[in-house]
Amino acid sequence: MLKKKKTEVYALGQHISMSADKARRVIDQIRGRSYEETLIILELMPYRACYPIFKLVYSAAANASYNMSSNDANLLISKAEVNEGTTIKKFKPRARGRSYPIKRPTCHITIVMKDISLDDEYVKINSLKKPRWKNKHTAMVYHDMYSSGGVWDKK
């Protein structure tokens, strides 16, 4: 029996103290990108969620270099997901003996990286791809060229 070589590694961050929606806003920007491009994006985005995600991406790359001895230039984020974690519930004391509940949401973030140099399917697909724009012979047309001149076309 032939054993397939491992092409994916992951890093998992649990109970990160932020809302899952705020983390998803950042994760949606990096999904499917290369490792180096992801680090640049995460350093330049102005969100608080970028730092824990940056640490997870860096950890997943370290896992890839240690477990698969892969190069950082060949890494691609194949899957990135955010799940809701437990909600931390506390009470804040207020005046006259009252208390207000505080709910701190947490989330679990999973980053899966793939080494494209080890993945045979990725190499085959990229070698078979042909640019689609070479087959089409369409000229660029100014969008207001065919306006009918009606009342609705004027600003």
From Swiss-Prot:
| InterPro entries for this protein | Ribosomal_uL22, Ribosomal_uL22_bac/chlpt-type, Ribosomal_uL22_bac/org-type, Ribosomal_uL22_CS, Ribosomal_uL22_sf
Q: Chief subcellular site?
A: plastid
* This protein's GO CC annotations: chloroplast; large ribosomal subunit
Subcellular localization(s) per the UniProt record: Plastid, Chloroplast
Q: Which GO terms describe its molecular function?
A: rRNA binding; structural constituent of ribosome
Q: Indicate whether rRNA-binding appears among the record's keywords.
A: yes
Ribonucleoprotein found in the keyword field:
yes
Keywords for this protein? Chloroplast, Plastid, Ribonucleoprotein, Ribosomal protein, RNA-binding, rRNA-binding
Q: Name one GO biological process term.
A: translation
Against Pfam families, the record matches this protein to:
Ribosomal_L22
Q: Where is the signal peptide?
A: none
**Subunit structure of this entry?**
Part of the 50S ribosomal subunit.
What this chain does, per the record?
A: This protein binds specifically to 23S rRNA. The globular domain of the protein is located near the polypeptide exit tunnel on the outside of the subunit, while an extended beta-hairpin is found that lines the wall of the exit tunnel in the center of the 70S ribosome.
Query: Of which family is this protein a member?
Result: Belongs to the universal ribosomal protein uL22 family.
Q: What is this protein called?
A: Large ribosomal subunit protein uL22c
Q: Which gene encodes it?
A: rpl22
